[in-house]
């Protein structure tokens, strides 16, 4: 009896250790993914009629003196991550690799590409900041990012143009994916409105997509002066520089897409109050696109949402919020009602009415 119990305990212990090893080496997944994007494995496979052998890939990589065994080990891990598929060729000698659905998200020229997101979030300085999680747990307002870099993330991006470009490209890549889903799943949300301001709209990716889908809407891009200065011009989109903590341009509808999660509750209440002042009481609304956390849920997206919350803790001092959090926040800002609508994304759509 004793030996059976010991064996069972040992088996559980091994599984626990394996789980912990996987967590410990979580950074390896990020950096293997970065390497895969940097050397263009997904694009090479696509351009080789969708499949490739190890020897073919060795000859096509933008690297000199590739060790085929080292490359094989990298590919083996990508197969384990379900990024690549693997089959044995007809001759039974060489393995043939192809892209799994997840792997197609690494294609640099794809509309759905997450390659810019991977490169933006895995740059050295952004990984270095995670060494200061402990320091970011204090009762003050100083984030782990500030402890690591000596300034907040927004100032860092302002004074480091190369890193800012990588970050912006990553955000734009994420925005393209999210905006496409938003316009398909919530088309009725945008119908009937006459004017919209994208508050904190970055380089204008979202507002351009909205204008293309709904050309009758008068569209405005609003962000900090240095962000507006680096955004692309569009003949039918007004660009306004400013500070959302000071004022927001008036319109029937204001959009806050992945903005409020960057900020504390106090900052968010301030932003929302400025937004409420800028929309008409009878026909206006604020559209918030952000995570609505379900803390106890076993939904497949829950871990991704919780990771984003820790990301906010470390980098911006903001947070992802539950439905109850959103209700409290909007009440504090003076909104009379709101509704939360899930979409096919990590985020949800929250419509707030003055």
UniProtKB/Swiss-Prot annotation:
What pathway does the annotation place this protein in? Answer: Alkaloid biosynthesis; (S)-reticuline biosynthesis; (S)-reticuline from (S)-norcoclaurine: step 4/4
Explain what induces or represses this protein's expression: Up-regulated upon fungal elicitor treatment or wounding.
Top-rank taxon: Eukaryota
Q: Name one GO molecular function term.
A: protein dimerization activity
Q: Which PROSITE patterns match?
A: SAM_OMT_II
Q: Matching InterPro entries, A to Z?
A: COMT-like (IPR016461), O_MeTrfase_dom (IPR001077), Plant_O-MeTrfase_dimerisation (IPR012967), SAM-dependent_MTases_sf (IPR029063), WH-like_DNA-bd_sf (IPR036388), WH_DNA-bd_sf (IPR036390)
Q: According to the UniProt entry, where is the signal peptide?
A: none
| A GO BP annotation | alkaloid metabolic process
Active-site residue list: 261 (proton acceptor)
Q: Which reaction does it catalyse?
A: (S)-3'-hydroxy-N-methylcoclaurine + S-adenosyl-L-methionine = (S)-reticuline + S-adenosyl-L-homocysteine + H(+)
Q: Does the keyword Transferase apply?
A: yes
| Tissue specificity remark | Expressed in roots, stems, leaves and flowers. Restricted to sieve elements of the phloem adjacent or proximal to laticifers.
What EC number(s) would the UniProt record show?
Answer: 2.1.1.116
Q: Name the residues that bind S-adenosyl-L-methionine.
A: 223
Q: For this UniProt record, give its keywords in alphabetical order, as a comma-separated list.
A: Alkaloid metabolism, Methyltransferase, S-adenosyl-L-methionine, Transferase
Family per record: Belongs to the class I-like SAM-binding methyltransferase superfamily. Cation-independent O-methyltransferase family. COMT subfamily.
**Protein purpose:** Involved in the biosynthesis of benzylisoquinoline alkaloids. Catalyzes the transfer of the methyl group to the 4'-hydroxyl group of 3'-hydroxy-N-methylcoclaurine to form reticuline. Also involved in the papaverine biosynthesis.
Q: What is this protein called?
A: 3'-hydroxy-N-methyl-(S)-coclaurine 4'-O-methyltransferase 1
Q: What organism, scientifically named, is this protein from?
A: Papaver somniferum (Opium poppy)
């Amino acid at each position: 009896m004793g030996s059976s119990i010991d064996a069972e305990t040992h088996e559980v212990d091994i599984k626990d250790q394996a789980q912990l090893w996987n967590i410990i080496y979580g950074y390896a997944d990020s950096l293997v993914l970065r390497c895969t994007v940097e050397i263009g494995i997904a694009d090479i496979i696509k351009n080789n009629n969708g499949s490739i052998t190890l020897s073919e890939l060795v000859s096509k990589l933008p690297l000199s003196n590739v060790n085929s065994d080292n490359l094989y080990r990298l590919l083996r891990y990508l197969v384990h991550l379900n990024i690549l598929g693997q089959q044995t060729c007809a001759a039974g000698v060489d393995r043939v690799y192809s892209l799994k659905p997840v792997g197609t998200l690494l294609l640099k020229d794809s509309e759905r590409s997450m390659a810019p997101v991977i490169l933006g979030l895995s740059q050295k300085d952004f990984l270095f900041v995670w060494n200061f999680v402990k320091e970011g747990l204090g009762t003050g307002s100083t984030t782990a990012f500030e402890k690591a870099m000596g300034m907040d993330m927004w100032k860092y991006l302002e004074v480091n143009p190369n890193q800012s470009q990588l970050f912006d490209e990553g955000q734009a890549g994420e925005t393209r994916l999210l905006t496409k889903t938003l316009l398909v799943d919530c088309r009725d949300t945008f119908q009937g409105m006459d004017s919209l301001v994208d508050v904190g709209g970055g380089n204008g990716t979202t507002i351009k997509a909205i204008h293309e889908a709904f050309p009758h809407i008068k569209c405005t891009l609003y962000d900090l002066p240095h962000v507006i200065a680096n955004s692309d011009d569009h003949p039918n989109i007004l660009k306004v520089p400013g500070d959302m903590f000071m004022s927001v341009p008036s319109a029937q509808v204001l959009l806050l897409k992945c903005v409020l999660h960057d900020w504390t509750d106090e900052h968010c209440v301030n932003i929302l109050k400025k937004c409420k002042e800028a929309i008409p009481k009878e026909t206006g609304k604020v559209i918030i696109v952000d995570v609505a956390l379900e803390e106890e849920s076993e939904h497949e997206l829950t871990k991704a949402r919780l990771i984003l919350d820790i990301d906010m803790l470390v980098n911006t001092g903001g947070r992802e919020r539950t439905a109850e959090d959103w209700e409290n926040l909007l009440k504090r800002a003076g909104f009379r009602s709101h509704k939360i609508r899930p979409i096919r994304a990590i985020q949800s759509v929250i419509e707030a009415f003055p």
